[in-house]
Amino acid sequence: MTREEATNNALSKVLLVKSTILNLGTGMGKTLIAIKCINKIADFNFKQNEEETTVSIIVPRQALIENWKAEIKKWGCNTDKIEILCYDSIHKVNNYSDILVFDEGHHLSELKREYLDSILKVNPNVKLLFLSATIPRDIMDYMKSLGTYNIVKGNIADGIKDEVLPTPIIYTIPLYLDNIKSVAEIIKNPRCSNPVTCNYDERWNFIKRFTTRKIIIKCTQKQYYNELSDKIDWYKRKFMFNKTVVFKNKWLRAASERLKWLSEQKVDICQSIISLLQDQRVLLFCNNIEQSLKFKDYAPINSKNKNSLQNLDDFNNSKINHISSVNMLSEGMNLTNCRVCLFCNLNASEILSQQKFGRSLRHPKPIVIIPYFKDTRDEELKDKMLKDYDSSMIKEITNIKDIKL
């Protein structure tokens, strides 16, 4: 589906349905389509009753408020009665707005849906616009349940196929966990003192013998990964058996720990890759703030860095060419002329993976680089992330010097 087709689809039905759901990938022009829908509704309302249309736009973060203001100024809006606020302030929304716009609509948690339900009770004729590249099934079902709807759908892969978005070169780099050198440690009885040390093959004997002493088990990368995976599987089975929230939390925490550990093992290869990218404009995705600080030449963008927005502005104005991100820049934040996206971290969330992938598609010749560990959760997430993309875009390489810039 082209941008023009998506726009025509939305505009042709926006006056006829309760909800217009713009389920479109990054770069497909969701914001502009939404503004055009607002204008069409506003024109219709003015012809009907000569009153200006009121609009409430709800966004995930404060920074996106400025994005919307800039887009409205750029494209023009047929009403001045517009309020823009964050999801956390949804309780402050004008209950009698003519149009409610939910940017990044996948943020509609159960609590936020309750607020929307309360608005619909007092304002049943309000028009709804939902914008999101990736909408979970439960939220999509909720959107459909609100009345008549029109879904305008197209993912990033569709946008590339239809030449709406540029075709990226995707380099995947298989890595292997070492199973020879003992470079990691597994700690048992961490709160105990008087530690003893053993190798991986001796672990069960030591665990049985030293129940009141701290045990340090020397192991390889592969053995450490297997230990993490066994722990995840055990917590998962316990949760599936008795549905106890405690085990669910431990299962999810262990799964997060595994992804963090895999990401840490890729720091060296990513350091080598970025040494080849000195002349490129690069976005590096990291797992955590501590990891991002290891890449000293990359300006960090994260929730703890008060200079994050300045770093983003400097990047977009070409004052700097290299930035790293931790749990930011995945949605709604535009990057100017960013050619390379390097993934030091892969996400279990399909929503986050696709949002991050879309950051690179603002450049006419984008490059995506994904190092991953074979036969691990990393490989599963890489395959899941790329499942919709044509194989001709994907180049598996074993030598980073094969990256063509």
Question: Where in this protein do the model-derived segments appear?
Answer:
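Conserved pre-motif I regulatory segment
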Residues: 1-23
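Walker A/P-loop
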Residues: 17-37
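Conserved helix-turn-beta segment of the N-terminal RecA-like "Helicase ATP-binding" lobe
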Residues: 53-55, 62-82, 98
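Conserved helicase ATPase core of P-loop NTP-dependent helicases/translocases
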Residues: 66, 70, 281-285, 290-333, ...
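Post-DEXD/H (motif II) to motif III coupling segment of the RecA-like Helicase ATP-binding lobe
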Residues: 110-170
